[in-house]
Amino acid sequence: MEEPFLLQDEHLVPCKDTWKSGQVTVELKKVSSLAAPMAAVTIAQYLLPVISVMVAGHNGELQLSGVALATSFTNVSGFSILFGLAGALETLCGQAYGAKQYEKIGTYTYSATASNIPICVLISVLWIYIEKLLISLGQDPDISRVAGSYALWLIPALFAHAFFIPLTRFLLAQGLVLPLLYCTLTTLLFHIPVCWAFVYAFGLGSNGAAMAISVSFWFYVVILSCYVRYSSSCDKTRVFVSSDFVSCIKQFFHFGVPSAAMVCLEWWLFELLILCSGLLPNPKLETSVLSICLTTASLHYVIPGGVAAAVSTRVSNKLGAGIPQVARVSVLAGLCLWLVESAFFSTLLFTCRNIIGYAFSNSKEVVDYVANLTPLLCLSFILDGFTAVLNGVARGSGWQHIGALNNVVAYYLVGAPVGVYLAFNRELNGKGLWCGVVVGSAVQAIILAFVTASINWKEQAEKARKRMVSSENRLA
């Protein structure tokens, strides 16, 4: 086992000197080379279920409603948890790679996969009873039946997520983003004809769309596994050390639970937003408009999400390597990219505010309402990009617990109450609800900015070093 690097920087360079030295420019190139492919990977992964929803929706309004309801429920109750838990691997695998503890990267990945499987079993039990659960919550029985059947056929896809999500973090920690991109694009191209065949050629309707998702994600698992198994790039890192297995599982949950809380609390807030919109006057209009805003914000988020993944990787690698100065510069580089992308996309959205609604609806009322909410949506673009980058810093550094507490305070103690008050008491309706989202994001951004500015980078690097050299892999 190779010994991790000792701390290599006696003193951190002041920010002013960092800018003058050109370190930020160098790091910008490195962060960008990771961020662009990761954004494309995220888009491709996002499109897989979207394509199935689109194909299934052409079978009728009932099918579309049922599939949309099932997609929302399964995202909240299952997929969000697995994606959240994977944040632990950004800390552990990234720091292990920086510390040249290559065999730990594979062991962490195997441990995460093994930990995900029993979680998927529990989630599957819930999904089996989705139809009855939705009916008990007052949903239309026909829509609930379609949603329940669709969710049932998504269970294999859930188990596929237990494998491919750790594999993607395994590759990301090593900076192997281009192979990851090629595998993801191959899966997307595979999914399109498979989805069409299951829905139309085999006549399986909405169930066929769910089956296609499951088949495609397992195809994704197979090609990712083949790359990891046979690529020379993974010779050192695919090793499994059985003696570290139990301690790696403990570390995975130590960082994974707060990481999952970070993700789930944010995902759940937006589902709560849609539910609240159904209680407003003219619920069809309010729900439609807020769904359009949410979809637009989600599509934009893949860009700062890619930057966040890149920053997380660079921060974790450099902390593990004992080079805190470069870790700090990575944060500055990520924020530079955020400034550029948020300025561009918020300006583009505002310029297109009067036509963006037509991409989703032909109703003039809906289009005008979306245009009215666009300034708030632009603010969301700016704040979401900022918080995404700083959440990436949190995952790379290993302080997910702070991020989770921050989300509770920002969204549930501030944002949600403000949104409900403005929507119902001040009668701002959907605009009021989205104001609550913006306020919550602003509070989240302020707290994250304060925490990030207060980071003792040498101390974080020392924690990463101790985590890697600990003979028993005890929790840091």
UniProtKB/Swiss-Prot annotation:
<feature type="transmembrane region" description="Helical">
    <location>
        <begin position="433"/>
        <end position="453"/>
    </location>
</feature>
<dbReference type="GO" id="GO:0042910">
    <property type="term" value="F:xenobiotic transmembrane transporter activity"/>
</dbReference>
<keyword id="KW-1133">Transmembrane helix</keyword>
<feature type="transmembrane region" description="Helical">
    <location>
        <begin position="146"/>
        <end position="166"/>
    </location>
</feature>
<feature type="transmembrane region" description="Helical">
    <location>
        <begin position="117"/>
        <end position="137"/>
    </location>
</feature>
<dbReference type="GO" id="GO:1990961">
    <property type="term" value="P:xenobiotic detoxification by transmembrane export across the plasma membrane"/>
</dbReference>
<feature type="transmembrane region" description="Helical">
    <location>
        <begin position="66"/>
        <end position="86"/>
    </location>
</feature>
<keyword id="KW-0472">Membrane</keyword>
<dbReference type="GO" id="GO:0015297">
    <property type="term" value="F:antiporter activity"/>
</dbReference>
<dbReference type="InterPro" id="IPR002528">
    <property type="entry name" value="MATE_fam"/>
</dbReference>
<protein>
    <recommendedName>
        <fullName>Protein DETOXIFICATION 3</fullName>
    </recommendedName>
</protein>
<dbReference type="Pfam" id="PF01554">
    <property type="entry name" value="MatE"/>
</dbReference>
<feature type="transmembrane region" description="Helical">
    <location>
        <begin position="331"/>
        <end position="351"/>
    </location>
</feature>
<feature type="transmembrane region" description="Helical">
    <location>
        <begin position="208"/>
        <end position="228"/>
    </location>
</feature>
<dbReference type="InterPro" id="IPR045069">
    <property type="entry name" value="MATE_euk"/>
</dbReference>
<feature type="transmembrane region" description="Helical">
    <location>
        <begin position="185"/>
        <end position="205"/>
    </location>
</feature>
<feature type="transmembrane region" description="Helical">
    <location>
        <begin position="260"/>
        <end position="280"/>
    </location>
</feature>
<feature type="transmembrane region" description="Helical">
    <location>
        <begin position="402"/>
        <end position="422"/>
    </location>
</feature>
<keyword id="KW-0813">Transport</keyword>
<feature type="transmembrane region" description="Helical">
    <location>
        <begin position="289"/>
        <end position="309"/>
    </location>
</feature>
<feature type="transmembrane region" description="Helical">
    <location>
        <begin position="370"/>
        <end position="390"/>
    </location>
</feature>
<feature type="transmembrane region" description="Helical">
    <location>
        <begin position="35"/>
        <end position="55"/>
    </location>
</feature>
<keyword id="KW-0812">Transmembrane</keyword>
<comment type="similarity">
    <text>Belongs to the multi antimicrobial extrusion (MATE) (TC 2.A.66.1) family.</text>
</comment>
<dbReference type="GO" id="GO:0016020">
    <property type="term" value="C:membrane"/>
</dbReference>
